Amino acid sequence: KQSFKRIVEWTREAIDKQFVQVIPLLEQNDVLVAANTEFAATGIAAYCKKPFVRTSFAPFLPGEKMPPPAFPYPKPNPIITPKLLWLMMNRVSNYMVKDTINKNRRKYGLAPISNFGEDAAKNSDNFLLYSRYLGHTDPVWDKRFRWNIGGDCFNDTFEYDEEAYQELMAFIKKEQTPVLFFTLGSCTSNDRERFCGMLARICKRKQYRLVVGSGWAKTGETLQGNEQLFLMQKPIPHHLIFPHCDAVIHHGGSGTTHSVARAGKPQLITPLLLDQPYWGYRVQVLGVGPERVKIAKVSESELEQKMGDLISNPEYKKNAAMLSEQIESEKGIENICNYIESLAR
């Protein structure tokens, strides 16, 4: 309860600051580009009379096909329908931000809004930064919103330590046994070491090799070193690693999910928050990996079964290869740049 209260207070303070700080900047430029979590952006763009490109890394547009991506149970339910869940999400967002937004809108001579979720989506140019082949779209969007979808904006210019990369590649290439990569990305979990311990023991039994992306949280730091384990302590870009792995187990962030899909590898997701359960569900629906597991609850025997399926199931490999070709055909960075430039003309 206290954590939620702090989040609400921080969000409201951020909205006040954004109106003050961003308006002078936008007045000197042509287009505002901001994430869907920048709650003040629609009002700022309206005041400056400038186009607003509202981006998101998951389908955060109200619809009738799927629940909100932040909802922890992403499979559509015939009783608790997606439409009902979107209404519930809008109530929460209205409680958090509507009064603060309207206070600032009145200050700048703008009409108040009645529903933040609908107002933000309807008064923006919505650009979805995920693959149409990996995420979903909803037919009702065409009737309600201005929207486009361009694919993931992969960052292949990420700087890395060449020596660390060569050390990793030497580990991967020294044997022919399957290689699993595990990462929690920029997230963490109180159960990360328990989960890493299970991964290491299972890999030892099955003669897999395990690479753990340690990250800022130092995931895997308690693991005992052995010839089947590589603890990656320096950041190395995913596009240089994943093509050399047999499968990836990860937290389900949009970027990591897309990177594994682009590499054409099966994946198993251990979602922690926000849209991660959604991407875990999509991985299962598309047949590029098994049903997601909860890092805090999965047993070692269940995880071992999932890992064996992940490595050996030929359908995952076939579907992942097909998905890779589709994602490779998208030009995410080029698409959003062209879209922004079209609005700035």
Predicted region positions:
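Structural detector of well-ordered beta-strand residues that form the stable sheet scaffold
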Residues: 32-33, 53, 181, 211, ...
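Nucleotide-activated sugar donor-binding and catalytic core shared by glycosyltransferases
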Residues: 25, 68, 81-130, 173-174, ...
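Generic beta-sheet signal
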Residues: 35, 55-58, 129, 149-150, ...
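Conserved nucleotide-sugar donor-interacting segment of glycosyltransferase catalytic cores
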Residues: 13-83, 133-134
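A short helix->loop->beta-strand "cap" motif at the edges of active sites that frequently abuts
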Residues: 48-51, 208, 265
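Conserved nucleotide-sugar phosphate-binding/catalytic loop shared by glycosyltransferases and other
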Residues: 1-6, 81
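Donor-nucleotide binding loops and adjacent catalytic segments primarily
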Residues: 130-247
